[in-house]
Amino acid sequence: AKVSRKPREPRTAVTQSTRRIKRKKTLSKPRSRGGVKAPKTTMKIKRALRRNLRRKIQTSAGQPKKAKKARKHFVSYYVLKKSGQNKKTNQNKRQNQNKRQNQNKRRGQPVPEQEIMEKPTTSCKWCSQGVTRRGRRY
């Protein structure tokens, strides 16, 4: 069986503090209703330091800046330049052709003339016809 004890009463009398009237806090900034931010009333002016200004003037006078080029639409053209690998293969083809011609001359056979024509690597309709986009033949 549980026995509940009475809480001990303090021997000294406790004086109850009188209630103070709570005052509403005074806000430093007026709050706007509706969650909209109020525009700032003060503006800060940024000032450059004097020595920095002098440096900037000296550097800008010595080296004028280049004008930036405006961006243009990206258009891809078929590149007619040969890469280093293509040049090597062409040299090998020519060497082989020269060897054949020399062998045929030694045998006394007529030399068949062949033109070396590179096939375009892309499936572009202009490239397969041997015409660039600007209408020039190569």
UniProtKB/Swiss-Prot annotation:
Motif range (Nuclear localization signal): 5-23, 54-72
Comp. bias (Basic and acidic residues): 1-11
Region annotation Disordered: where it falls in the sequence: 1-138
Low complexity: compositionally biased ranges: 86-101
UniProt biased composition (Polar residues): 120-131
Site label Binding to nucleic acids, positions: W126
A molecular-function term among this protein's GO annotations: DNA binding
GO CC term (a single one): nucleosome
Start-end of Basic residues biased regions: 19-34, 43-57, 65-74
Modified residues (Phosphoserine): S4
Name of the protein: Spermatid nuclear transition protein 4
Gene this chain is encoded by: TNP4
